[in-house]
């Protein structure tokens, strides 16, 4: 709250300030204050009327949905599911190649991404082909 509003809100300070003004000035200030208060009341009532109208419309639409056999919660849930925007996770690709790493563990590779170092080394140094690592079904 600003200093001017604090002065207007405090009756003692207001009386002290009013002693320095003429009666005509005080009446003019009162008229202006009444105009401002009336404008504010009109704004508040207009805002309340808008909220009431919106609530009435929402209730009307809700009744229309129920009349058509649609549960409003079902509609909200379907809208939320469509709006979520999260992508569905892809299914993991099946392993296509199998190899034994330096620790003696059998590992698999889908064929996507970088070629594992063990397979790359075997292809370069031992002359193996990628088909040599295929998992036979």
Curated annotation (Swiss-Prot):
A GO term from the CC aspect: cytosol
Key words of the record: Coiled coil, Cytoplasm, DNA-binding, Repressor, Transcription, Transcription regulation
DNA-binding residues: 112-117
Site features described as Interacts with Hha, chain residue numbers: 12
Assembly mode: Forms oligomers of increasing size with increasing protein concentration. The fragment of 1-83 probably forms oligomers of 4 dimeric units at 10 degrees Celsius, at 40 degrees Celsius only dimers are formed. Binds Hha and YdgT (also known as cnu); crystal structures suggest each H-NS dimer could bind 2 Hha monomers on opposites sides. Probably also binds StpA.
Domain remark from Swiss-Prot or TrEMBL: Composed of 2 domains (approximately residues 1-64 and 89-136) joined by a flexible linker. The isolated N-terminus (1-64) forms a trimer, probably via coiled-coil interactions. The isolated N-terminus plus linker fragment (residues 1-89) forms homooligomers of increasing size with increasing protein concentration, while the isolated C-terminus fragment is a monomer. A shorter fragment (residues 1-46) interacts with Hha.
PANTHER family: DNA-BINDING PROTEIN H-NS, PTHR38097
Role, per record: Acts as a global transcriptional repressor and binds to the minor groove of AT-rich DNA. Silences genes by altering DNA topology; in magnesium concentrations equivalent to inside Salmonella-containing vacuoles (SCV) it forms rigid and elongated filaments on the DNA, and in higher magnesium conditions it causes DNA bridging/folding.
Protein name as it appears in the record: DNA-binding protein H-NS
Name of the coding gene: hns
